[in-house]
Amino acid sequence: MSKFARRCAALMLAVVLLCMAVPAAFAAEGDALPAGATTMGGANTTLIPDEEENCLSWLFGSGDTITMPYLNVKGQGLRRNVTLDLEDCLVGITYTELGSIGSYVSDAAAQQAWKAQAVAIHSYLEYHKKYGSSANALVYTPVDQIPSSARSAIRRAVSEVKDEVLTCNGSVIDAVWSASAGYNTQTGVYGTCSGLDAWGTDVPYLQSVESPYEEQYHNLMRRVIGKDYRYIEYNDSKTGQPYESADTTHKDLGGFVQYNTFVSNGKSYRYIGQFVSSRYCFDFSADENGTPCMNYYGFGHGVGMSQCGMVGYAQEQGMGYRDILRHYYTCLLYTSPSPRDVEES
């Protein structure tokens, strides 16, 4: 079918769908709307029907751009309805996340790490667009603010994978990641945290997996992306009270305190995030003076892909980006063309 014929057909379908939608707009005020699915964060996913959305994108052409409901832009803060060139978008966010790692690992390893990060970013953005959630956890660095050597190297990686997303059972996944995973003192294994243990929601592709290069690469990644991986805390962040006692004995593969198992000063916490910021891997102990304290390791929620771990896999084992992604995002998972390419084919 010619491009002109395709667009004519799409236009006719769009008109039909619009005519069907008009009566619904004048429905009685008390009419119930469809509930829609929800994300892990509880966002309602009642959206334009996929057929209509795809039809309009096919008709008018999405090209190589991506539009996000919300996005943090470096130096500009949180912006709404941001439209960017897809490749520039992935280059800018990948740089924010991983920086110039090519200065610290081999070019081949850096390329695979950047590719893995870019595919995870693209999947995350598409997931949150699809389900009506804001993707404002990400920060886009405008490409003209990225040093030219880093920009060129990252663009070389991104250009080869910009049309790939991650799917599980046919749907794009919420490809979350964090700077590092943790260490389980009980098993002696470094690994990630499952979605169930971190947030109380069992997600098939967010399971605990081993991630052996955390300790080896955390100092490197701290220099690259400027995040602290170790610190000591003397007060409970939720109450501001000094620690007197705590129980952190129930841990998952990654050494993260499990869902609904932390007790501090006699109080049980249902969600770990209610009392610390974003660091969830810790042990209760005492400092050299005998003062009770929390020793934290890692940065981030520890769920999904570990940035320290994936850089380690690329450098130490020569692992390619697809194998890295399959390792961290379990389930029957594969990479595929983005919805944008399917519509344009």
Model-predicted regions and their roles:
Residues 334-345:
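Single conserved hydrophobic/aromatic residue that forms the stacking wall/gate
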Residues 2-336:
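Conserved, single-site charged/polar hotspot
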